[in-house]
């Protein structure tokens, strides 16, 4: 059968595609001792769900063993192995939500990830712009492939899982929860922000986004108004060792474990002393720590990592592995085939007390509805309640020194 993707570019960065088996695929099948399963088969899953669940979707070819005479005529049947049809798989993706997000983005370079915090199901994963996977099924032409490769908007690049960007101020609620737990700050800690913070014993100053400052600021206000100086001080007091350790607990610096090939998901960077020395053969400096407090410096994250970290905060430390598969079922009537369901794996970041989680959430609520919230105008008239965190950072593109 010829694989056809009816929704075109809408689901490409989730589903991936199938295409002709090449030498690299054959080498992998030989290594896995599965080449015999592809007798008479020309296509194989190359990316996304098609690749990750290839063995589930593919099935097994059938054949029979017969005895023949000297003229090649069949004398008798020795054995028969009927073909096994691949299983149907059911995904967690909300197609209408996926299409709605894609419509809002309208081809702009962006990524959106929507997770269900109750179980880790991926409801939408959009990387814009995308491309039509049907181009690859029968073998893509050189002209079409070159057009995709040279497109300045990089449609082949999965921004949601491979794009690494400074998480910027979106991480302030996580840092606040960690600092409260560590005793670096309390709910009553107040600073007076004059628009900058100075590294002790130096003349180095780090600016706040609000040049004239925010005045008196506590932890709730620091999230509501995204006060940079509050987090410069936290970063200085915590140090990179504790800061990096805590953010690793939220999943930064590692793959999420989503059911798509590891080669399609970036670890991004949660910097620490060891990382900098391995990367640059340089020691970690105190000045390197300060921008990490506002999600910048060497720190990068994928949109999927950021969504995953948020679900951990929402659940007071409970973590579910993001997953796209709901279950599988036999696609034919006949002998029962075992169904596969994704286990709801969860862990508990139980070192954070309930009051610290609540402070982070209260600050995020005020981002949207507080009188000084950075996103108050966007959510002022919504018929529902929500919480969130804004973040702005300079982002470097795929080409060296290209800013967009």
Name the predicted role of every residue range.
Residues 1-111, 126-159, 164, 335-345:
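Extracytoplasmic/periplasmic proteins that interact with beta-lactams or build/remodel peptidoglycan
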Residues 68-78, 118-169, 174-404:
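Beta-lactam-recognizing serine transpeptidase/beta-lactamase-like catalytic domain environment
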Residues 112-117:
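Short hydrophobic alpha-helical segments used for membrane anchoring or interfacial signaling
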């Amino acid at each position: 059968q010829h694989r056809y993707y009816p929704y075109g570019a809408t689901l490409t960065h989730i589903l991936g595609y199938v295409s002709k088996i090449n030498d690299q695929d054959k080498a992998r099948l030989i290594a896995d001792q599965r080449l015999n399963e592809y007798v008479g088969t020309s296509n194989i899953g190359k990316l996304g769900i098609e690749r990750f669940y290839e063995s589930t979707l593919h099935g097994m070819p059938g054949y029979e063993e017969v005895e023949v005479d000297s003229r090649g005529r069949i004398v008798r049947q020795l054995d028969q192995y009927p073909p096994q049809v691949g299983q149907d798989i059911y995904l967690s993706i909300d197609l209408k939500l996926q299409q709605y997000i894609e419509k809002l983005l309208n081809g702009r370079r962006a990524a959106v990830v929507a997770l269900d915090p109750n179980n880790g199901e991926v409801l939408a994963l959009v990387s814009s712009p995308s491309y039509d996977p049907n181009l690859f099924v029968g073998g893509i032409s050189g002209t079409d492939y070159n057009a995709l490769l040279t497109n300045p908007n990089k449609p082949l690049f999965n921004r949601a899982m491979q794009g690494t960007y400074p998480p910027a101020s979106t991480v302030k609620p996580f840092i606040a929860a960690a600092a409260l737990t560590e005793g670096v700050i309390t709910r009553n800690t107040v600073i007076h922000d004059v628009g900058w913070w100075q590294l002790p014993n130096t003349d180095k100053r780090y600016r706040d986004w609000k040049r004239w400052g925010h005045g008196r600021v506590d932890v709730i206000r620091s999230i509501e108004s995204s006060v940079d100086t509050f987090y410069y001080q936290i970063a200085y007091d915590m140090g990179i060792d504790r800061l990096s350790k805590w953010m690793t607990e939220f999943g930064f610096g590692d793959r999420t474990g989503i059911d798509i090939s590891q080669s399609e998901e970036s670890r991004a960077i949660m910097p620490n002393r060891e990382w900098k020395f391995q990367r640059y053969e340089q020691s970690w400096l105190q000045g390197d720590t300060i921008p990490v407090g506002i999600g910048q410096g060497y720190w990068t994250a994928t949109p999927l990592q950021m969504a995953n970290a948020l679900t951990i905060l929402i659940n007071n430390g409970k973590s579910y592995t993001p997953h796209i598969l709901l279950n599988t079922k036999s696609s034919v009537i006949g002998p029962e085939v075992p169904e596969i369901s994704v286990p709801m794996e969860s862990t508990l970041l139980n070192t954070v007390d309930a009051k610290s989680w609540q402070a982070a959430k209260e600050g995020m609520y005020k981002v949207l509805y507080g009188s000084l919230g950075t996103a108050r105008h966007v959510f002022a008239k919504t018929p529902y309640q929500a919480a969130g965190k804004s973040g702005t950072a300079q982002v470097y593109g795929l080409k060296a020194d290209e800013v967009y």
